[in-house]
């Protein structure tokens, strides 16, 4: 196994099965963040993740962290909070603000550089990247964004500036996603936070099989239309 240097003149990727075991899932470096290359990556189960100043690194870890939306774990306290939630939740109202929020709300730095923000904003304008916003009155207090692949959603990042804001984003999105035929959420790499929400690890081979099936599926044509998903009770 060896690390592959990508060409700027081709958007082809090597097979994810050739990714390194250590660091787990590192597959290639270089290339660019053009919409065509990003979409090719997601279609093959590959995503970019790198530190500012480093070359673009491309990953496909084994195992892969996923969340079956129906298995989302909601604690009793979160259920009580949501019943009296002060938040309004929207979809695709403020993609730019959400990704900026994800980039700025990291105390120890972030991989979401200016170039990454611009790249995913282009994907959003093309209808492939989407955001969920959580509002307290007119203030954006949390949210999440990711890339759609048919009935699979590749979650990228989330942020929270008030109590339970990011959990509210995920809860409301999962309910809406399941209700319209969504099947699976890609969480990339398991961490304590995603594990507490019900995410689990599956073999990369299984994830790629799910991806190949689900990316050909379709949600309703109007699913990603900007709209309000949840409003607080009066």
UniProtKB/Swiss-Prot annotation:
SUPFAM superfamilies: Acyl-CoA N-acyltransferases (Nat)
GO cellular component: cytoplasm
Localisation per UniProt entry: Cytoplasm
Protein's UniProt name: Leucyl/phenylalanyl-tRNA--protein transferase
Catalytic activity, EC: 2.3.2.6
Subunit structure: Monomer.
Source species: Escherichia coli (strain K12)
Catalyzed reaction equations: N-terminal L-lysyl-[protein] + L-leucyl-tRNA(Leu) = N-terminal L-leucyl-L-lysyl-[protein] + tRNA(Leu) + H(+); N-terminal L-arginyl-[protein] + L-leucyl-tRNA(Leu) = N-terminal L-leucyl-L-arginyl-[protein] + tRNA(Leu) + H(+); L-phenylalanyl-tRNA(Phe) + an N-terminal L-alpha-aminoacyl-[protein] = an N-terminal L-phenylalanyl-L-alpha-aminoacyl-[protein] + tRNA(Phe)
Molecular function as annotated in GO: aminoacyltransferase activity; leucyl-tRNA--protein transferase activity
Role of this protein: Functions in the N-end rule pathway of protein degradation where it conjugates Leu, Phe and, less efficiently, Met from aminoacyl-tRNAs to the N-termini of proteins containing an N-terminal arginine or lysine.
Taxonomic lineage of the native organism: Bacteria, Pseudomonadati, Pseudomonadota, Gammaproteobacteria, Enterobacterales
